Regions:
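Short structural boundary motif marking the start of a folded domain
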Residues: 1-6
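Intrinsic disorder/low-structure terminal segments
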Residues: 7-9, 35
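Short acidic beta-strand-loop surface patches of small beta-rich interaction domains
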Residues: 9-15, 41-60
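Generic structural detector for well-ordered beta-strands
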Residues: 16-20
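Short amphipathic, charge-patterned alpha-helical segments
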Residues: 21-40
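Loop/turn positions that initiate beta-strands
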Residues: 66-69
Length: 72
């Protein structure tokens, strides 16, 4: 199984996460909400500077190791 290592930033926290490459962003948003009690409808990726498509995975959208993800 392949993974992407990312930094998830929310409120005043940052967490290193190892995300399987096959997980769609919509599922990832739900999982992050459950794990960290966060709310958001979109996931933003830096340094790409894009709002991620909920129907695609991080890998399909070119998100690479070390990317910073934030909920919007």
């Amino acid at each position: 199984m392949e993974y992407i290592l990312v930094i998830f930033c929310f409120e005043d926290r940052a967490e290193d996460l190892k995300i399987p490459t096959f997980v769609p962003v919509s599922d990832l948003i739900s999982l992050l909400g459950e794990l960290f009690g966060t709310k958001g409808k979109a996931l933003h990726a830096e340094p790409r500077g894009i709002i991620l498509d909920k129907n695609k995975t991080l890998a399909e959208q070119g998100v690479e190791h070390g990317a910073i993800l934030t909920l919007e």
